[in-house]
């Protein structure tokens, strides 16, 4: 089904931008990666992840695209580990990855880290992915939660990233798409600064996806985002 998509990134209040993103409508592929690591290693890791994922899909031949997501992310994991071993200054680098591939009327998606995919449909915004973070696991847990959970020093710690260790457990989920649906892929610079309700109202706009994506990033900046800020907005034609 016809899909329009557009991505925007901004370094925010950081000296460098360690986010990378990809919109490839020929492949139906959308990716956001938020890198981490010293000596500019974060931007190396995120750029490698995006490039490897795209290369896997571009060279897939007749393999169904929905079957490639896990292989693509695991290939990115291996490439980042190799690059870190070859360059000591990049040791310990890693990145989040959230990737969506649209095939006919379905979206297949995977996420590692705390970058997210949201689905907007009929006035409602739903977070499709679950953060791989201490905070998310604590909130989902059955035990007693710390009273200071909102300010806890562990709240931003990720439990899974691409490039951290050789074994990477990634899963693929899917959802049906309908005319008028919108997808938002974003780094934590967006969802950490912009309230869910405001994201929903911006995605409800009938403006072009370029304008909506720019508005999302601008809103994060206006609300004091301290991290790099990246958003991809995709919309299924009515």
Question: PLM ranges: what are they?
Answer:
Residues 1-238:
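PP2C/PPM-type serine/threonine phosphatase catalytic domain
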């Amino acid at each position: 089904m016809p899909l329009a998509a557009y991505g925007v990134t901004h370094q925010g209040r950081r000296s460098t931008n360690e986010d990378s993103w990809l919109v490839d409508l020929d492949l139906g592929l959308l990716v956001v990666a938020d890198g981490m690591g010293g000596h500019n290693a974060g931007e190396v890791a995120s750029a490698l992840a995006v490039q490897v994922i795209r290369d896997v899909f571009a060279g897939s031949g007749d393999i169904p695209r929905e079957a490639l997501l896990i292989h693509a992310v695991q290939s990115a994991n291996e490439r980042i580990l190799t690059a870190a071993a070859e360059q000591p200054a990049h040791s310990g680098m890693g990145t989040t990855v959230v990737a969506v591939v649209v095939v006919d009327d379905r979206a297949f998606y995977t996420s590692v880290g705390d970058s997210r995919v949201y689905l907007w449909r009929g006035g409602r915004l739903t977070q499709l992915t679950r953060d791989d973070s201490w905070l998310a696991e604590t909130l989902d847990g059955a035990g007693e939660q710390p009273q200071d959970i909102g300010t806890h020093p562990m709240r931003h710690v990720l439990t899974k990233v691409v490039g951290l260790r050789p074994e990477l457990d990634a899963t693929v989920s899917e959802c049906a798409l309908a005319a008028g649906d919108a997808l938002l892929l974003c780094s934590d610079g967006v969802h950490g600064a912009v309230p869910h309700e405001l994201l929903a109202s911006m995605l409800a706009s009938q403006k072009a996806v370029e304008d909506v994506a720019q508005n999302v990033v601008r809103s994060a900046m206006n609300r004091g985002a301290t991290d790099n800020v990246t958003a991809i907005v995709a919309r299924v034609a009515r």
